[in-house]
Curated annotation (Swiss-Prot):
This is Acetyl-CoA decarbonylase/synthase complex subunit gamma. Its cofactor is corrinoid; [4Fe-4S] cluster. It holds the Pfam family FeS. Heterodimer of delta and gamma chains. The ACDS complex is made up of alpha, epsilon, beta, gamma and delta chains with a probable stoichiometry of (alpha(2)epsilon(2))(4)-beta(8)-(gamma(1)delta(1))(8). It comes from Methanocaldococcus jannaschii (strain ATCC 43067 / DSM 2661 / JAL-1 / JCM 10045 / NBRC 100440) (Methanococcus jannaschii).
Length: 488
């Protein structure tokens, strides 16, 4: 098992001047942030001086993860892979969400290449406030023609700012392609038989690249990586073969590589893993697969199978994926799973507490109280917008906990509600003193009424039911409250 590094180990190598030039109040604080990957070593200007050169190298060795962080792309967009330190997310966190690339064949017409490249770059959907996108474009030399390949590369780089992977098993084709590539590309792929030729090509062209090493044998991948490192090629990616007909074999290879890197500290296997769900797509077009019986359309079957394989591989250490399908229904589950896997379990997923107007609320609009757990917030606001709900949404600071959890933990309470009402000035924006609570928070009604002096109404269990609840009840609730308070 790798040695556990502490902030004190890093602190001992820092200047200890507490100059604050790094942006943190002390060297110990900076050491802690370095350990947590929330700061970079270049933020300390003193470490960049000749006097601290050796210390800087030692710190880099200490904080470098067992799986090397590798990137390709350009100044505007980079695809970053690897950087993980643990086998399981609960042990720390996973870093650098798996870049997902989609292929473009050089057999397509120039217009088709241009359109597909734009489609890949512009693909986006939003979930819980985060925009989920594709990360790179794979240009395949399907034609075998060098000129077509070079032209496709030029079109993609001209039309988009996406990082690119150039894919050919022929080192001579790659050599010519590298002459026209402007950015730092990922090169797919060198095999055991062609590795020497690829090393020669990279040295001749003198181009900064990420080289993919492809083999179905872990020992061969290790030997290939050792040879590359000996030749000064350090940005490597390992590609154990992806077997759609027997995906368990690929999963075993992924686990063996990652376990060797993290638990056995094998530096020759400490590189990102690339998997190819695209193989599953083409396999399913020509062969029966586990989901063939569910759909008649072969294309639909192939894309469903590709997405299934992609998710399976991402659950077992795939640091980058290459796919073919572009349908939203295929990519949405893959990108959603990626977002979930790479959520940092050490940090609550929270939004800023405060007052959020939904629609165009006025003085007679309802006031609804929820929590600042991000999934709750975005689900609630999404449901409200779909159902044309107009209201004032009060978002309480519950430490990023959901309604039922914060009620049980005591964060959803009268004191916090009172503080929120005072800080947001909601009392000046409405003519009533009514707060609608989620049904799951019904037990806090008395406490909130006592602490705030507002009347609490228990609403629905689910935010999708709020629209109907307000349309059927709000006017009556408001009228009764005004009559009661005018009488009083």
């Amino acid at each position: 098992m790798p040695k556990k590094i502490s902030a004190m180990d890093i602190y001992k190598l820092l200047p200890k001047t507490n100059c604050k030039k790094c942006g943190y109040p002390s060297c110990m604080a900076f050491a802690t942030k370095l350990l947590e990957k929330e700061a970079t070593i270049d933020q300390c200007p003193i470490l960049n001086t000749p006097k601290f050169e050796k210390n800087k190298k030692k710190i880099i060795e200490l904080i470098s993860p067992p799986v090397k962080e590798v990137w390709f792309g350009n100044e505007e967009k980079k695809a970053v892979m690897g950087g993980d330190e643990v086998m399981y997310r609960y042990q720390l966190s996973f870093f650098n969400p798996t870049p997902i690339g989609v292929d473009i064949s050089d057999e397509l017409s120039e217009e088709e290449i241009k359109n597909r490249a734009k489609e890949i770059e512009n693909f986006v959907f939003e979930r819980t406030g985060e925009k989920l996108k594709l990360d790179f474009i794979v240009i395949r030399n399907a034609s075998g023609d060098v000129e077509k390949f070079k032209k496709a590369i030029e079109i993609v780089e001209k039309e988009t700012k996406m990082p690119i992977c150039i894919a050919s098993l022929n080192p001579e084709v790659i050599k010519e392609a590298l002459k026209v590539v402007k950015s730092k590309p990922m090169v797919y792929a060198a095999t055991k038989e062609t590795l020497n030729d690829f090393i020669k090509v990279i040295k001749e062209v003198k181009k900064d690249v990420v080289l993919v090493l492809s083999s179905n044998n872990v020992k061969d991948l290790k030997n290939m990586a050792a040879k590359c490192l000996a030749n000064g090629i350090e940005d490597l990616v390992l590609e154990p073969h992806t077997y759609p007909e027997n995906i368990a074999e690929t999963l075993d290879l992924n686990v063996m590589i990652r376990r060797s890197a993290i638990e056995k500290e094998d530096k020759y296997l400490g590189f990102p893993i690339l998997n190819l769900p695209i193989n599953a797509y083409y396999y399913a077009l020509k062969n029966e697969c586990p989901i063939s019986g569910f759909f008649e359309d072969k294309e639909v079957v192939a894309k469903m199978f590709e997405a299934t394989i992609a998710n399976t591989l991402m659950n077992r250490y795939a640091d980058a994926l290459i796919m073919h399908g572009m349908d939203i229904w295929e990519l949405m589950p893959v990108l959603t799973l990626r977002q979930c896997i790479y959520t940092d379990p050490r940090k609550p997923q929270a939004v800023e507490p405060g007052l959020y107007p939904i629609g165009n609320p006025d003085e007679n609009s309802p006031v609804i109280l929820t929590t600042n757990f991000s999934l709750t917030f975005y689900t609630v606001t999404g449901d409200f917008e779909k159902d044309n709900v107009t209201c004032w949404l009060l978002v309480m600071d519950t430490g990023g906990k959901a309604v039922d959890v914060s009620v049980a933990g005591g964060q959803y309470n009268g004191e916090n509600a009172k503080k929120l009402i005072e800080e947001t000035g909601i009392a000046d924006k409405v003519s009533h003193r009514i707060i609608i609570l989620p049904a799951l928070a019904a037990s806090t009604r008395g406490d909130i009424e006592d602490k705030t002096g507002w009347t609490c109404v228990v609403g629905t269990r689910d935010s999708s039911q709020v629209g109907d609840f307000l349309r059927n009840n709000w006017d009556k609730i408001l009228k009764e409250w005004k009559e009661k308070n005018q009488t009083a």
